[in-house]
């Protein structure tokens, strides 16, 4: 059974749409505790900490009976958008979102998603989760943006969608029409590389 260690609705929808059985439990890991300047490595470290935090607290979580003695996979993900060497998380306000989109208009950036899969077995009687394998990888996709007029950017920012997304855009939402093309994994831009997950769930 798979546990998604994230509160992300886009990751939840990706898993539901491709019919992967899972339950969703937020890890509540404090991301501000990690200091890593390399964006690629930061995404990977945050994904690991989210999954690991949940694995360490699994005994305090009420899990369905089918988890007992069975294989358990905990998936942690973290997405960071890189534009010209700078990390773009969620914009803090509309003004910041507008300024970013002015820069990104007609340009490209990279969406890095760190993936960590902690695989093991959980014994609900002893409350012990025994880890057998940890698989980690950062998957990167190149995202090309359309050349936009100021009124288009303002119109998009006014929807508030950019304020809730890494990089200030949602491929699966309103922002999809402002993205010209993607090089690399498509679902990775929405926060989870489904081909990577399929390959590694199959291995486990």
Swiss-Prot record:
Keywords (A to Z) from UniProt: Cytoplasm, Hydrolase, Nucleotide metabolism
Active site: 78 (proton acceptor)
One annotated GO biological process: nucleotide metabolic process
InterPro entries: ITPase-like_fam, Maf-like
Coiled-coil stretches noted in the UniProt entry, renumbered to this chain: none
Catalytic activity, reaction form: a ribonucleoside 5'-triphosphate + H2O = a ribonucleoside 5'-phosphate + diphosphate + H(+); a 2'-deoxyribonucleoside 5'-triphosphate + H2O = a 2'-deoxyribonucleoside 5'-phosphate + diphosphate + H(+)
Chief place where the protein resides: cytoplasm
Cofactor: a divalent metal cation
CC terms in the record's Gene Ontology section: cytoplasm
Gene3D superfamilies per the UniProt record, alphabetical: 3.90.950.10
Subcellular location: Cytoplasm
Family, per entry: Belongs to the Maf family.
Alphabetical list of HAMAP family matching this protein: Maf
Role played: Nucleoside triphosphate pyrophosphatase. May have a dual role in cell division arrest and in preventing the incorporation of modified nucleotides into cellular nucleic acids.
Protein name: Nucleoside triphosphate pyrophosphatase
Provenance organism: Prochlorococcus marinus (strain MIT 9215)
């Amino acid at each position: 059974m798979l546990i998604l260690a994230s509160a992300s609705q886009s990751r939840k929808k990706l898993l539901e749409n491709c019919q992967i059985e899972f339950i969703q439990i937020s890890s509540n890991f404090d991301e501000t505790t990690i200091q890593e300047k390399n964006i690629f490595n930061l995404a990977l470290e945050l994904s690991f900490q989210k999954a690991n935090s949940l694995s360490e607290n699994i005994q305090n979580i009420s899990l369905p009976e089918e988890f007992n003695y069975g294989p358990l996979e905990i998936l942690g993900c973290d997405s960071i958008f890189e534009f010209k060497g700078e990390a773009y998380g969620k914009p803090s306000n509309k003004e910041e979102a507008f300024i970013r989109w002015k820069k990104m208009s007609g340009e490209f950036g990279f969406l890095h998603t760190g993936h960590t899969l902690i695989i093991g077995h959980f014994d609900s009687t002893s409350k012990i989760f025994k880890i057998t394998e940890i698989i980690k990888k950062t998957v990167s996709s190149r995202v090309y943006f359309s050349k936009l007029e100021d009124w288009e950017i303002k119109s998009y920012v006014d929807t508030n969608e950019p304020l809730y997304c890494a990089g200030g855009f949602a491929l699966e939402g309103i922002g999809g029409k402002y993205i010209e093309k993607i090089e690399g994994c498509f679902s990775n831009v929405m926060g989870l590389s489904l081909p990577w997950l399929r390959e590694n769930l199959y291995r486990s």
